[in-house]
Every structure is written in structure tokens, then in C-alpha cells.
């Protein structure tokens, strides 16, 4: 079990679960990207589930939560809101207190600060039908995923595309930034790609076609968005 998996299972300490639920969660945690892991931890803080069934409901609806990268407190959140969401006039910015803007925004919706970022509910979750929720897919809905490793993290971290948050730089998506943070590196030149999982099974041996992680990730970002447009 990887370090990420152990940290996620620690959140479920004391939860009763069947073997099939445990096995599914183990696979799901192993397949989580860095961003999914962050969303899950934030959602656990927001929802505070008390039963394994509720955790499975939550984990199958992570797309109902949104991450604001780097907005780790009210001040950071206030700057994020003013720079990327509300865009107040320059004449008004001098009179706005970022901490108060951030606090006001935070109090409007279910939310939590998590490891230097802000997680909020973006849409209401839909109760899934009672039954065996472990029959749901054990990995996120990505067009392509790449597993990166570094000297500091040889276990590797999955990063998935497309990443479609409305408030991020599409050329530097939160998925990638969070993966670099988890790998304790600043650039892709410090990483190696160790695995690829593509939504199109006819595309094979992708890893062997690239000499660098940077080139592979650049094409994965483009591929992920292309796949997302075909699903519109």
C-alpha cells in the first residue's frame, strides 16, 4: 500500500466495512490522482460521513466538489476570488480587504481548507441508489492518466486529463500542479513517467513513444481536452 493510500485509509479509522468495500476502496485510492485525493480529503471535512456507505457515495461524486489551488486561508481565498472570479474594478480593489472577501465567500457554501488549498461544494450531490456501490468504476473519469515519479516519490502519483476547472490556467492545470507538489519537484524535467492509462484501448505502448515526461504530459493535456469535446 502506497503512502497516499495509507493516508486516505487513516481518514476511515473506526469505520466498519466489508471485505469487498475495503478491496474496492484500496483499488480506488491506488487509482486516485493527486487532485482526486485532495478533493476526497476536503469533501470528508465538509460532509463528515459516519458510515462506509456514505463514504462510497461521496467518493463516487467527487466531481461535485471544486478546488481553488493555493487558496489556503481567507486571505489567499480573497485574492483568488478577486483575481479569478469576481474581478472588481481597480478603483475598488484598494478598499477591499482580501481576508474579509475570502471569509464572506467561504461562508456562502459548504467548504474547507485542506493542505494549503480551498475545497468547496460546486453542485449538490445526488443520492446514489442503495445497493453495492463497489460496482462503480474504481478510477476517475479521465481521457488519459499518466503516473509520474520523482527522486522524492518513487511510488509515483497519477495525474489525469482533462482537468476542467473554470478558474485555472488550462496550460498548467491543477491536476499537474498538485502532482508536482506531491512529487516535491518544481518542473516535469525532474520527473519520469512510469505508467499510462488511456481511455482509448486501441492506443497502446504510449509510454515507449516518448523520451520525456514533459512531452508526454503536454500531449496528454491536449488529448484530454480533445476527448472532453467529443463527449459534449
Predicted segments with their positions:
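N-terminal interaction modules that seed assembly of large macromolecular complexes
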Residues: 1-29, 156-158, 162-213
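Extended, well-folded catalytic/binding cores that form a central cleft or groove in large enzyme
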Residues: 28-31, 46-47
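Ordered, amphipathic secondary-structure segments that act as subunit-interaction surfaces
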Residues: 32-39
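Internal, hydrophobic cores of structured domains that mediate oligomerization or house catalytic pockets
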Residues: 45, 52, 108, 128-177
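Extracytoplasmic/secretory-pathway segments with low complexity and glycosylation-like composition
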Residues: 53-61, 65, 69-81
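Acidic, proline/glycine-rich low-complexity IDRs
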Residues: 75-151
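Conserved small/polar residues in nucleotide/adenosyl-binding loops
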Residues: 230-231
Amino acid at each position: 500500500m502506497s503512502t497516499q493510500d495509507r493516508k486516505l485509509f487513516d481518514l476511515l479509522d473506526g469505520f466498519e466495512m466489508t471485505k469487498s468495500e475495503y478491496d474496492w476502496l484500496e483499488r480506488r485510492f491506488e487509482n486516485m490522482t493527486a487532485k482526486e485525493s485532495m478533493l476526497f480529503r476536503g469533501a470528508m471535512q465538509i460532509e463528515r460521513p459516519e458510515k462506509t456507505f456514505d463514504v462510497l457515495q461521496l467518493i463516487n461524486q467527487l466531481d461535485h466538489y471544486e478546488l481553488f489551488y493555493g487558496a489556503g486561508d481567507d486571505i489567499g481565498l480573497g485574492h483568488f476570488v478577486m483575481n479569478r472570479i469576481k474581478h472588481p474594478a481597480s478603483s475598488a480593489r484598494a478598499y477591499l480587504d482580501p481576508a474579509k472577501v475570502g471569509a464572506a465567500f467561504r461562508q456562502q457554501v459548504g467548504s474547507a481548507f485542506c493542505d494549503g488549498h480551498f475545497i468547496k461544494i460546486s453542485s449538490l450531490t445526488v443520492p446514489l441508489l442503495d445497493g453495492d456501490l463497489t460496482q462503480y468504476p474504481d478510477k476517475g473519469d479521465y481521457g488519459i492518466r499518466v503516473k509520474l515519479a520523482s527522486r522524492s516519490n518513487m511510488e509515483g502519483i497519477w495525474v489525469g486529463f482533462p482537468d476542467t476547472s473554470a478558474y485555472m490556467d488550462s496550460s498548467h492545470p491543477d491536476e499537474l500542479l498538485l502532482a508536482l507538489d506531491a512529487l516535491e519537484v518544481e518542473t516535469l524535467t525532474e520527473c519520469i513517467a512510469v505508467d499510462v492509462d488511456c481511455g482509448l484501448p486501441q492506443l497502446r505502448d504510449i509510454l515507449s513513444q516518448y523520451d520525456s515526461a514533459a512531452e508526454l504530459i503536454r500531449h496528454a493535456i491536449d488529448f484530454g481536452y480533445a476527448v472532453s469535446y467529443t463527449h459534449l
